[in-house]
């Protein structure tokens, strides 16, 4: 419930754990029995919503449904059986919502991330690691360590070996070490913020330590020894933990231990934040119902900038291209129905449009497409990221008609791609020399023309000569003709 002070309070809470991941990660799809249980539980929640006269809701599915081969069938059955429409979150959307919830609830967040900090989000299907430095998001990477698969592997070999902790560490360490070698190198991580489904349960198993929000390395080691020495059933009964979560405690704590060992952090922050609270925080933020002391868009752009840095993009060129692109966008935004997210997509596309040159210069645009399409950008859905990838691809390349590439678009909006690519082509050509000859531009829409007034004291014959060809495509998409005019600065 939201109140007038732009905060919210919980008025009721109901929950039920259904272990759907077991089906997906073992069999590749959700079983008929699991689908039936989902529908039964959602019917109960539907009655609860009717009790409170709820008219607006959010129903999300994550990796257990997202990675199931029968995902579309599952969603269709749920909607027709319960009337509830479920939205499947991409991994980046899911982790971004978790991040928002952490910022909303954890009052010490900004103080902690002022130093080199790793945000480690362990889910049932994978692990998301995000690195912060001086309050800025430096990099985020999804590592395919599946806690459910790790648990099943433990069950398979556990009775055959007395070296369970060593085997477990070997199983997990490979991916964590690869992450360290690529992203950490000599960087020293001061803090770890641990979130995930079992973090609050982990704190319960060492009640004598009275752990609240911070775990020292010595406390963590004591916690690890207790988890590895007790079977899941005993952990569940002794500490009042749901059995399904108890079975995931050893895989989770092994993952955290591996990261602690590889980054040498001495403290781990464990705020009590569950995903439902994160969903509420995201809902409040989307509707501007609450004001966060954090700029999430800057985190998304920081991720894009670090991808550009990784692939040795010409920083001066891509930043000027982005600046010019946004100036054009802001003029055509309202009359042509563009929105805030598309502005962000355009900015990211401008920052990353040359990243493919790192692979080779012969086919840079297609290389850039593959890099963007396969790189995690926290805060963008799969569809939004693929639209950015296509904008980058069709910045220099011919854009075929929709019917010729509809299969390749994978649900992306063709019109959005065309509109953003048209802007990027103009912005990019204004710095064709990569020498920033144009100091600034002013953009106006007048008499069916987009007037771009370039301020420069340099010879921009190259840019002006190539401008007309790019203007043809822009006019084809928007129905207005870009015109380049030059204002000589002294």
Regions found by a protein language model. Give the residues of each.
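N-terminal basic/disordered segments at the start of proteins
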Residues: 1-9
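Helical "lid/coupling" subdomains associated with nucleotide-phosphate turnover
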Residues: 4, 23-52, 64-69, 74, ...
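Active-site-adjacent helix-turn-beta-strand microarchitecture at beta-sheet edges
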Residues: 123-126
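A short amphipathic beta-strand at an alpha->beta junction
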Residues: 266, 478-490
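C-terminal amphipathic alpha-helical interaction region
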Residues: 405-407, 437, 484-489
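Short secondary-structure junctions
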Residues: 432-438, 476-480
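Short, non-transmembrane amphipathic alpha-helical segments
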Residues: 461-481
